[in-house]
Design a protein with these regions (language model features):
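Hydrophobic faces of well-ordered beta-strands that scaffold small-molecule active sites
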Residues: 29, 82, 115, 139-141, ...
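Anion (oxyanion) recognition and catalysis
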Residues: 109, 171-172, 199, 259
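Glycine-enriched alpha-helix->loop->beta-strand junction motifs that scaffold or abut catalytic
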Residues: 133-139, 199-204
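Short acidic/glycine-rich loop or secondary-structure boundary segments that cap or lie
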Residues: 149-150, 187-190, 214-216
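Conserved strand-turn element in the central/C-terminal portion of the radical SAM core barrel
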Residues: 156, 168-189, 240-244
């Protein structure tokens, strides 16, 4: 089936297996209930997927809805990391209609897998009932600004306030949460201000630098030139001259922030478990793609 719904080209496609062995540093398996993502983030690395899927449409304007054989033996994934949403957002707006992510979670109940859900949506609160049944599950929201205008320039996902509210609701339901400050835009992202907003409702606070490569490098550089002209020299130093001093200074700032708030500070690690409220583990993912082979998610 193929149709256009609210300007998005929707196709329903068959896939032999929804579970894919992952090359991600945190993954045993990557699971993407959809192909494409209608958040249309300007900096999204996943737009490279078009090379493999054959889509000619602009990234963010299409979505393939996958149909897969039911997972008959979820115990097969016991102890494995399962990342939901590595190159899509399982809670894109179309999830309300198609329900693929909810169906996936239902099939993973009893798996004893270590599940990580990556999203920019507040729709995840719909599935709190299932998240509670899954045991080891973590929900991560990407939040790299408190400025809704900048957010709207970058993506069409849920508002920052809605993401923060969803994080609070999921956290209070007893589910481990992550605030993923990704990507950190030089001169724009104030990660300490974000930390102060979310520290009482997240267990982990990840920091990742903005990577610029491929087609979206020009998009972002042109945006900075048009909207933040004073930052052009900084972006030129970082992304054309490969000067790392800015992010090296941010690492120092993040470590000082950890001491200030009595939080653990770890380098390219993903600790497990819950932490005392108000003291999330701060995870330094700056330049981690060189160590572990990934980019902004």
């Amino acid at each position: 089936m193929e149709e256009v719904i609210n300007g998005i080209l929707i196709r329903e496609v068959e896939t032999k297996n929804i579970m894919t062995k992952s090359s991600l540093p945190v993954g045993g398996y990557s699971v993407n209930p959809y192909v494409g993502c209608t958040h249309a983030c300007k900096y999204c690395y996943a737009s490279f997927m078009k090379r493999f899927t054959g889509h000619k449409e602009e990234w963010g304007t299409f979505l393939d809805v996958k149909h897969w054989p039911e997972i008959k033996n979820p115990k097969k994934y016991a102890g494995q990391r399962v990342v939901i949403g590595s190159v899509t957002d399982g809670y894109n707006p179309q999830e309300e209609q198609f329900g693929n992510t909810r169906k996936l979670l239902e099939q993973l109940i009893g798996s004893d897998a270590d599940i990580l859900i990556c999203t920019k949506s507040d729709l995840v609160v719909r599935d709190i009932d299932l998240l509670k049944k899954l045991g080891r599950v973590t929900v991560s929201w990407s939040i790299n600004t408190l400025d809704e205008n900048f957010k709207n320039d970058m993506d069409s996902a849920s508002s920052i306030e809605h993401r923060i509210a969803a994080m609070k609701q999921v956290y209070e339901a007893g589910i481990r949460t992550v605030c993923f400050v990704s990507p950190v835009f030089p001169g724009i992202t104030d990660f300490e201000a974000i930390f102060e907003r979310v520290k009482d409702q997240c267990d982990l606070f990840w920091l990742e630098n903005l990577n610029l490569r491929g087609g979206f490098k020009k998009t972002i550089m042109d945006y900075i030139a048009g909207q933040y002209p004073d930052l052009v020299p900084l972006y030129d130093e970082i992304y054309n001259k490969h000067n790392r001093s800015y992010f090296e200074a941010l690492e120092v700032k993040a470590e000082k922030m950890a001491k200030k708030y009595d939080c653990a500070f770890v380098d390219n690690e993903m600790p497990y478990g819950r932490v005392p409220q108000g003291h999330p583990v701060i995870v330094d993912y700056f330049y981690h793609e060189e160590i572990r082979g990934t980019e902004n998610t």
